[in-house]
């Protein structure tokens, strides 16, 4: 069975299938903020969506982080390192990509295990 969370015409915020939860790329609600604050905002959104499906960040198995500018790598990691619990870091890739809104500095896509 496939379950779609907060579906819209173009995408669902999350999809549950085969024991995994796939979150769509999460983007900041505070586009005028710096990369650290934008990252913290996105991570809070991830926490909220995981809570909605009955999970916590400890269940995250894979993450892809898109940065508009790799110069923000350390600033992004400042928020990330405060958020990830010791010994619970998921597999992760961080890449530079042009994001849909030029004010966004970060987008994060997550896969978690049920």
Regions found by a protein language model. Name each.
Residues 1-114:
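Short, polar/acidic, helix-capping and beta-turn segments at strand->helix junctions
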């Amino acid at each position: 069975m496939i379950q779609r969370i907060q579906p819209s015409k173009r995408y669902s915020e999350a999809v549950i299938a085969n024991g995994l939860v796939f979150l769509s790329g999460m983007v900041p609600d505070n586009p005028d903020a710096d990369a650290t604050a934008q990252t913290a905002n996105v991570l809070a959104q991830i926490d909220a969506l995981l809570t909605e499906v009955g999970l916590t960040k400890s269940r995250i198995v894979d993450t892809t982080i898109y940065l508009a500018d790799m110069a923000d790598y350390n600033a992004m990691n400042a928020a990330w390192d405060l958020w990830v619990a010791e010994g619970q870091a998921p597999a992760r890739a961080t890449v530079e990509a042009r994001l849909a809104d030029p004010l966004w500095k970060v987008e994060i896509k997550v896969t978690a295990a049920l």
